[in-house]
Design a protein with these regions (language model features):
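Short proline/glycine- and basic residue-enriched helix-capping loop/turn segments at helix->loop/beta transitions
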Residues: 42-46
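Basic/aromatic recognition patch in beta-strand/loop cores that engages polyanionic ligands
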Residues: 49-78
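Short, hydrophobic secondary-structure boundary micro-motifs
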Residues: 30, 52-54, 94
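Enriched for short, Lys/Arg-rich terminal
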Residues: 69-70, 74-96
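Conserved beta-strand segments that form the floor/walls of ligand-binding pockets within enzyme
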Residues: 5, 65, 81
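Arg/Lys-rich, positively charged N-terminal/basic patches that mediate binding to nucleic acids
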Residues: 1-34
Length: 96
């Protein structure tokens, strides 16, 4: 079954997203949002071509929106490798 792998930067992004959600909305909502992101990444690993081609970011890059965030990834042999998870208001060119 295809899966996803987070790079260290993507792990840091996810940690910051969850921490910010806890601060703003509480632990229960953070858990819901973490589960939403996990489910979306698992689905994206199964159907990696759902994402938009983003060779402007780096060769082989794709992006896909999840709620208020954009996942940047590339297709791997086992699913997807997630490079970053950025808020939709962030300029991706400043984070790669």
């Amino acid at each position: 079954m295809p899966s996803y792998r987070l790079t260290p930067l993507a792990e840091e992004d996810l940690f910051n997203i969850i921490s910010s959600t806890i601060e703003s909305w509480g632990s229960a909502q953070a858990k819901v949002y973490a589960q939403t992101i996990d489910a979306a990444l698992l689905k994206l690993a199964q159907y990696p071509d759902f994402g938009r081609e983003r060779s402007d970011i780096y060769n082989g890059a794709k992006s896909f929106p999840i709620e208020k965030h954009i996942v940047f990834y590339q297709i791997s042999d086992n699913g997807i490798d997630v490079a970053r998870i950025l808020h939709q208001r962030m300029d991706p060119s400043k984070h790669f």
